[in-house]
A protein has these predicted regions:
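C-terminal transmembrane helical hairpin of 12-TM major facilitator-type secondary transporters
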Residues: 68, 86, 92-98, 102-163
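C-terminal membrane-cytosol helix-exit motif in multi-pass small-molecule transporters
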Residues: 3-31
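Interfacial helix-cap and linker-helix signal at transmembrane-aqueous boundaries
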Residues: 1, 77-78, 108-109, 194-202
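Juxtamembrane intracellular "pre-TM" segments in multi-pass secondary transporters
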Residues: 26-54
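A late C-terminal transmembrane helix in Major Facilitator Superfamily
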Residues: 154, 165-202
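Small-residue-rich transmembrane alpha-helices and their cytosolic helix-loop interfaces
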Residues: 1, 59, 91, 95, ...
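Cytoplasm-facing, short amphipathic helices at loop-to-helix transitions on the intracellular side
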Residues: 52, 114, 170-174
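Extracytoplasmic gate region of multi-pass secondary transporters
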Residues: 47-107, 157, 191
Length: 202
C-alpha cells in the first residue's frame, strides 16, 4: 500500500507537465480556427456512422468474452476436477501473453489495415473458443487456450482506438473511444452476470 501511495502521489508533479503549450503540427493551421464540436454534435455524427456502430458492437462482444472467461473459466475447471492452480496458471498465461499480443497488434496496426486485422483477431478468437470446447479437456488444452487467448485478449484495444482515430481524427479520439469502451463495459457486465446466472440455474 505504501508503494502504491507513492506512485499515486507522483501523478501530481508529473501532471504539471500537461500545462505545457499544445503541440500544433505545421499542416494543422487551416483547421485550428474551426470551432470545436461539442459532445452532442459528435454523438449525432457517431450514431449515424454505421462502421462506428459495428465497431462498438464488436467491442461489446469483446468485453463479454474476456470477463466471462476471466471470471467463470477457473470455476468451470474446478467443477471438472482440476485444481485451483490450473485456473490460476491459465489466468497468468493470459496476462503474460496479453502483453505480447497487445504490443504486436499495435505494431501491425501501423503497417497493415486495422479493420482487417481486427476482423482476423475476432475470427481467430471465435475459432479458438470453438476448438477449446470441441477438444477433450486437459491441462495441455487449458494452457494452450490460455496462451492463444492471451495473444488475442486485449490486442483489440490498439486496433479499435486506431480505427476510431482514422474515422473521426485524433481531436475527438478520447470522447469517442470512451463511448466505445463503455459498450465494452456493458458486455463485461453481462459476461460476468449471465455466466453466474447460468451456473446458478443449471
Amino acid at each position: 500500500l505504501l508503494i502504491t501511495s507513492v506512485l499515486v502521489a507522483l501523478i501530481v508533479p508529473l501532471a504539471w507537465m500537461l500545462k505545457a503549450p499544445m503541440y500544433q503540427a505545421p499542416n494543422a493551421v487551416a483547421t485550428a480556427n474551426k470551432p470545436a464540436m461539442g459532445f452532442k454534435e459528435i454523438l449525432v455524427i457517431a450514431k449515424n456512422h454505421k462502421p462506428f456502430i459495428w465497431l462498438a458492437l464488436g467491442f461489446l462482444v469483446c468485453g463479454f468474452q474476456v470477463v466471462f472467461l476471466g471470471i467463470h473459466l477457473p470455476g468451470y475447471l474446478t467443477d471438472h476436477g482440476f485444481s485451483t492452480t490450473t485456473g490460476t496458471v491459465f489466468l497468468a498465461l493470459v496476462g503474460l501473453f496479453n502483453i505480447v499480443g497487445t504490443y504486436t497488434a499495435g505494431w501491425l496496426g501501423d503497417k497493415y489495415s486495422k479493420p482487417k486485422l481486427l476482423m482476423w483477431l475476432y475470427g481467430l478468437r471465435g475459432l479458438t473458443i470453438i476448438a477449446f470446447l470441441a477438444l477433450p479437456l486437459s491441462t495441455w488444452t487449458i494452457y494452450s487456450f490460455g496462451i492463444i487467448m492471451g495473444l488475442l485478449w486485449l490486442s483489440t484495444v490498439p486496433l479499435t482506438n486506431g480505427i476510431v482515430a482514422n474515422m473521426f481524427g485524433v481531436k475527438y479520439l478520447t470522447m469517442l473511444s470512451g463511448i466505445v469502451f463503455f459498450t465494452h463495459q456493458i458486455g463485461s457486465f453481462f459476461g460476468g452476470w449471465l455466466g453466474g446466472l447460468n451456473h446458478d440455474i443449471t
